[in-house]
Amino acid sequence: MAAAAAAAAAGDSPRRGTPDSDEEDYEEYVPVAKRRAMEAERLRRATKPPTTNAVAVAAPPPPPRSTSSPAVGEVAVKTSLLVKATKLKREAPEVTPAERLLQQEREMIEHLSDRKALMPVGEIAKGISYSEPITTGWRPPLRLRRMPRSRADALRRSWHILVDGDDVPPPSRSFGDLRLPEPILRALRGKGIEKPTPIQVQGLPVALSGRDMIGIAFTGSGKTLVFVLPLIMAALQEEILMPIVPGEGPFGLIVCPSRELARQTHEVIEMFLAPLMEAGYPEIRPLLCIGGVDMRTQMEVVKKGVHIVVATPGRLKDLLSKKKMNLDNCRYLTLDEADRLVDLGFEDDIREVFDHFKAQRQTLLFSATMPEKIQNFAKSALVKPIIVNVGRAGAANLDVIQEVEYVKEEARIIYLLECLQKTPPPVLVFCEHKADVDYIQEFLLLKGVEAVAIHGGKDDEERKDAFKSFKASEKDVLVATDVASKGLDIPDIQHVINYDMPAEIENYVHRIGRTGRRGKTGVATTFINKNQTETTLLDLKQLLIESKQRLPPILADLDDPQEDDKVAIAQQSGVKGCAFCGGLGHRIEACPKQQLQNSVTLARARSDYFGGGGYRGEI
């Protein structure tokens, strides 16, 4: 004790950690509730308006207080994150639920659009980009070139044609104004085609002038002629200027998602080439490049030199990768049913095909269903594109009478026989699964109905013979999966039966579009039951309302709890329905197709992580 007193008397300061130093550093703890109350009082005083008094003299302002240390008796209070967040929330403008959902949709679309451009790898690596479309030798007649813009717009409105793009060529109401060779005009008249349809009125001048194009029109509107005739003219011009040599070509390429559609397009091309050759024009050699056919027969045509190739992605990629054919001179590319081709299933194959192009090309994309997301992605491959739209993308053909029936799953096969009595043959029956196709065909054959079947599990000869006999009216019923739903043109079909409702509404639109073609009226009957999701039924309900069709009671009683929000979002964004798949009954955040693609992408990433083979490559 004496030593400690002596040290204190000598003025020695206490060491750190002693009780005396702890007392000097001590800071009184203020409870959270008290700090919040003090902060609320401070904010109340700060926002309280000053009271005016005519008699009272304003008090002098208090001397400035140092903010570094609080005054004696006061406790330093720091602004908490909760208070800051509350203040920011008060100051932020009020956002409605519809605006919040719209912002979420924009973020999702921006994220989905963040994909590599649909361009050759060589062009991306070298930074090559084209600012102007290619030029062709075709020019419209003088009277069309001098047509006032107001007159052209009035014609488009009368045909319900919507165009988007710069320097859009004027529409042409006659095939004669397009300067097509007389043999082609005779072939058109021989098929009973006297006047162009709305998509042909505007689409043909755009394609003939060399512009990149996205063509959207309902099923059965004549989209095939819009890309076939300009391709024939381009190949004819190339052959006249510089004849093709063995092993060279093609000049033009058409890619289709199915063998049946590719074969049908090839037949249309041959229909126009035959009269041209008879009239003395140079020979134009087309090639059908599809799977299931001996590659040696295809190679014989390639060795002679080929002008036009109609192909499916798989066989085309195979020929290009094996260097059996090249696209060095290809200047014309068409993607038929483009929404399917640039979708997740075929996107990798299409990218590989694009990598084989060596120069600029004219690119045309066509489909009846082209959602906004697909349009935005497809534009990455186009140069100053022109969008020609006849009706809403994904709208049903108004010449089709749509009937929806609630049928229990076990009663569908019996009710199918009753539905076959509605109209005379031919009738097309669609199923989701291959097993159902075989089962229905066998059942109909046992009942004495002449039926044939098509699905992906059958070889090419079986599919070819079945389709040929059905098209020639030798068979009454064709049972098929969705391989027969897109693009196939059988004008005499009067009735389409959906044995089960497809999960994606765009497949439904393509299915029912096999009837009601070329201005004729058709009937589409669809079976629904408890297996369909609410989203699918809402899409179907809105499509029936848009087409002014009768609603069955089960769909009429189906309520959408978010209908008001969807209407508000559609008014603000200008996009009706889902921007991903085109369905009218849901928005993109509830899109089943988008959720399915996310799960597929996640599964791919997981398989890449675990590996596919090799040392410790499989777990």
From Swiss-Prot:
Q: Where exactly are the zinc fingers annotated as CCHC-type?
A: 576-593
Which superkingdom heads the taxonomic lineage of this protein's source? Eukaryota
Q: Write down the chemical reaction(s) this protein catalyses.
A: ATP + H2O = ADP + phosphate + H(+)
Ranges spanned by the short sequence motif Q motif, renumbered to the chain? 173-201
Q: Does the keyword Zinc apply?
A: yes
Question: Which GO MF terms does the UniProt record name?
Answer: ATP binding; ATP hydrolysis activity; mRNA binding; RNA helicase activity; zinc ion binding
Annotated region (Disordered) at 1-72
Domain Helicase C-terminal residue range list: 399-559
Positions contributing to ATP binding:
A217, F218, T219, G220, S221, G222, K223, T224
- Provide ranges: composition bias, Low complexity: 1-10, 49-58
Which residues constitute the signal peptide according to the record? none
Keyword flag Metal-binding: yes
Q: Which E.C. number(s) belong to this protein?
A: 3.6.4.13
Known InterPro entries for this protein? DEAD/DEAH_box_helicase_dom, DEADc_DDX41, Helicase_ATP-bd, Helicase_C-like, P-loop_NTPase, RNA_helicase_DEAD_Q_motif
- An example Pfam family from this entry, by short name, is Helicase_C
Any one annotated GO CC term: spliceosomal complex
Helicase ATP-binding domain sequence ranges: 204-388
Q: What are the BP-aspect GO terms?
A: mRNA splicing, via spliceosome
Task: For the motif DEAD box, give the residue ranges.
Answer: 336-339
Provide the alphabetized UniProt keywords.
Answer: ATP-binding, Helicase, Hydrolase, Metal-binding, Nucleotide-binding, RNA-binding, Zinc, Zinc-finger
Domain notes from UniProt: The Q motif is unique to and characteristic of the DEAD box family of RNA helicases and controls ATP binding and hydrolysis.
The record's similarity note reads: Belongs to the DEAD box helicase family. DDX41 subfamily.
> What protein name applies here?
DEAD-box ATP-dependent RNA helicase 35B
Q: What is the scientific name of the source organism?
A: Oryza sativa subsp. japonica (Rice)
